[in-house]
Amino acid sequence: MSEEDISLPIIDLSGYLSPKSPDDRQNVIEQIRDACRDFGFFQLKGHGIPISLQKELLKSLGTLFSMPKEEKMKLSYLENPCRRGYEASGMSMREGDAMPDSKEAYYLGREDPVVEFSGFYGPNVWPNLPEEDFRGPVWEYYQKTSQLGKTIWEVLLQGLGYSTDLMEAFAKRPLVQMKLIRYPSPSVTLPGQFGVGAHNDFGGVTVLLQQAGKDGLEVWLEKQQKWLSVPALEDVYVINCGDMIMKWSGGRYKSVRHRVINKTEGERHSCATFWHGDVFATNPLNPEDPNKETVGQLLVKRFRHQMSIHKEGLAQVGEL
């Protein structure tokens, strides 16, 4: 295969979810294992999430971001101890970037009644919109992609020869975060400005829905030293591994840099669900790992300068 022919594999998960032969599940496990080893990314069809729900989610996303700016700012994630809510354009910038991201975003997670463990658990912030226009479809979608993220973790464990029994403790009370994103039209983006600058995801499994026909995601190919454009296909998800998976798998699964550039005229919408595991869970990708570092400890190191993490919260996750 020439460099020009390189593309992310498209894997059909239906062979794992509803196998028709004794080999179907193992074939999917091996395909996902190989994709995560070679690319750290793959595309996924046959995932079981209705396309009607995907479209409802994207419609709800559009409704949210079309609200007046002053109404959106009332939902600011900076006012929330769990960092749930709205992020305005220009508020994210990574070290080395010339300009901040052009995207707008809205964050939500598990719906817990009180703030616990450094803000990783707690209540969401919901806009004042009719239930059927936002909260209903968004929450249903969150639950569906949460289940899909868990399934991918199960496959990753089996790809390294471990039993899915390890998921019982790992998924006891999982940290699952979701991010709704709107990228502005290229016509209103500054020259050289990215929708999202180059970065690695920091945690576990990412489940990404792209608005069909609105390309923008690019993945870095280290061997070829080039960016690979990932097409935005209808009813096809993009799955990738974060830094936690790469570390815990001993590098057998990759975490790879990626970025977003809106390449088509008009807005571009997407939604990413991040499945990390229980805050007190340790490494299921290597049960014999002597480090015994927990999900919470890893995420605190990543977030301690972004979230309102106080001494009590650090002690709760064993990081004090």
Curated annotation (Swiss-Prot):
Instruction: Output the PROSITE patterns linked to this UniProt entry.
Output: FE2OG_OXY (PS51471)
One function term, GO molecular function aspect: dioxygenase activity
Cofactor(s), names only, from the UniProt record: Fe(2+)
What's a Pfam family this protein contains? DIOX_N
Stored InterPro entries? DIOX_N, IPNS-like_FE2OG_OXY, IPNS-like_sf, Oxoglu/Fe-dep_dioxygenase_dom
Where do the annotations place Fe cation binding? 199, 201, 258
Q: What is this protein called?
A: 2-oxoglutarate-dependent dioxygenase thnC
